[in-house]
């Protein structure tokens, strides 16, 4: 089920996962997506977003390992699938921005909320 994309597209307390480091990283993801949306032809904006996504996913997965998070395998699979899809982007238009925004919102409010109170 798709979660509504906030407008304006900004992090708010409904995205709080209970871990300050991850909340800050999520805030930066919102900012990087907005930067890409504002400059869709910028290869550097797309690269910066993808590089940060990879770093963020690794940070989450490292925390999962530390606490032996029960959903870590499934969660990592969703990360890997998104990275694979995102690395395949050649152009960034309305559909791609919508995909990225929807994925992030659904992922935080769905998968990431499963670790709230655990990490």
From Swiss-Prot:
Amino acids binding Fe cation 2: 60, 75, 79, 107, 112
Pfam families assigned: Hemerythrin
UniProt KW keywords: Iron, Metal-binding, Oxygen transport, Transport
Presence of the UniProt keyword Iron in the record: yes
One MF term in the entry's GO annotations: oxygen carrier activity
Residues in the signal sequence: none
Binding site for Fe cation 1: 26, 56, 60, 112
Keyword Signal: no
CDD domains with a match to the protein in the record: Hemerythrin
InterPro entries (UniProt xref): Haemerythrin, Haemerythrin_Fe_BS, Hemerythrin, Hemerythrin-like, Hemerythrin-like_sf, Hemerythrin_metal-bd
SS bond list: none
Highest taxon above the source species: Eukaryota
Family: Belongs to the hemerythrin family.
Function: Oxygen-binding protein. The oxygen-binding site contains two iron atoms.
NCBIfam families named among the record's database cross-references: bact_hemeryth, hemeryth_dom, Hemerythrin
Annotated protein name in UniProt: Hemerythrin-like protein
Organism of origin: Naegleria gruberi (Amoeba)
Gene this chain is encoded by: nfa1
């Amino acid at each position: 089920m798709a979660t509504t994309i906030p407008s304006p597209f900004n992090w708010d307390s409904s995205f709080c996962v209970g871990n300050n480091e991850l909340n800050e990283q999520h805030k930066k993801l919102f900012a990087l997506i907005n930067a890409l949306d504002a400059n869709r032809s910028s290869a550097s904006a797309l690269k910066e977003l993808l590089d940060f996504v990879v770093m963020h996913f690794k940070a989450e997965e490292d925390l999962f390992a530390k606490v032996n998070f029960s959903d870590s395998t499934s969660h990592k699979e969703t990360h890997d699938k998104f990275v694979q899809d995102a690395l395949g982007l050649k152009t960034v238009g309305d559909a791609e921005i919508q995909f990225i925004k929807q994925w992030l919102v659904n992922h935080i409010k769905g998968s990431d909320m499963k670790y709230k109170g655990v990490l």
